[in-house]
């Protein structure tokens, strides 16, 4: 199926992204033209710089740009869940303002692997990342495959991004509060629902401006808490004691 026959919602949580936001939205909107219908939902997560002002200006230029605002910083995971509840189109993707996924790749990726219920994007490499970031990413992969060996046997990278059917997202809606586990939880829930899950390797664009919070000890602890909680939940699902 061609992108011109597909409707897509793109979610983008942002926090103090005044340096990135205009370029990110301009590039994303160019790619949106390739789709039958597309919307970009930006969640301003309590920014205290000029991010909100720039978003307001951009929303005048782009009618399919929806700006949501958190009055305080609540984190990526909660912002994503907020955005997921607002999507209108058939497929859903999330990206960051620093564009780790180049918007120009979106249509090509979808057409390569269509049809699917969930398409997991896996990073080709970790070039130019710090040793700490590489260690955390590799350690995270190992831990996930220890806790969920069968469900993740064919998935190497659960912490980049994905493209998912809206109907499946509603059934696999996450409870995670950690940005490091929310995507993994959705993937696992989709697997337990026997969804058609595919993977594709894509180029990862390293962040150039501002800072990312992935790899901070507090976020790692939240991630472990989410992981253990969902592992217990998944055992009950497998045993038939609890539903999704």
Spans of features found by a protein language model:
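Hydrophobic helical membrane-anchoring modules
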Residues: 1-6, 147-152, 175-244
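Short loop->beta transition adjacent to catalytic acidic/histidine clusters or analogous donor-positioning motifs
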Residues: 6-8, 29-41, 50, 63-66
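Short, well-formed alpha-helical segments that are part of the catalytic scaffolds
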Residues: 17-31
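Donor nucleotide-sugar binding loop of glycosyltransferases
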Residues: 17-20, 47, 76, 102
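Acidic helix N-cap motif at the loop->helix transition within catalytic regions
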Residues: 19-23, 49-58
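Conserved donor nucleotide-binding strand/loop of the catalytic core
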Residues: 38, 52-86
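A conserved acidic beta->alpha catalytic loop
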Residues: 44-53, 99
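Acceptor/aglycone-binding surface of glycosyltransferases and processive sugar-polymer synthases
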Residues: 70-86, 91-94, 103-180, 207-215, ...
């Amino acid at each position: 199926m061609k992108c011109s026959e597909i409707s897509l919602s793109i979610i983008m949580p942002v926090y103090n992204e005044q340096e990135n936001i205009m370029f990110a939205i301009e590039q994303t909107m160019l790619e949106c033209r390739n789709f039958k219908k597309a919307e970009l939902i930006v969640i301003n997560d309590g920014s205290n710089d000029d991010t909100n002002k720039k978003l307001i200006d951009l929303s005048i230029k782009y009618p399919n740009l929806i700006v949501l605002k958190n009055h305080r910083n609540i984190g990526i995971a909660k912002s994503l869940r907020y955005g997921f509840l607002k999507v209108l189109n058939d497929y859903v993707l999330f990206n960051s303002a620093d564009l780790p996924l180049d918007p120009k790749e979106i249509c090509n990726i979808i057409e390569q692997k269509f049809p699917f219920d969930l398409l997991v994007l896996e990073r080709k490499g970790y070039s130019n990342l710090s040793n700490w970031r590489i260690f955390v990413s590799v350690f995270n992969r190992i831990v996930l495959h220890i806790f969920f060996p069968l469900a993740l046997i064919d998935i190497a990278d659960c912490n980049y991004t994905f493209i998912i059917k809206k109907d499946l997202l509603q059934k696999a809606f996450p409870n995670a509060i950690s940005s490091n586990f929310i995507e993994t939880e959705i993937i696992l829930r989709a697997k337990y629902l026997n969804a058609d899950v595919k993977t594709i390797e894509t180029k990862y664009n390293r962040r150039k401006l501002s800072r990312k919070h992935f790899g901070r000890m507090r976020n790692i602890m939240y991630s472990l808490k989410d992981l253990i909680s969902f592992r217990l939940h998944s055992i009950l699902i497998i045993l038939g004691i609890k539903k999704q």
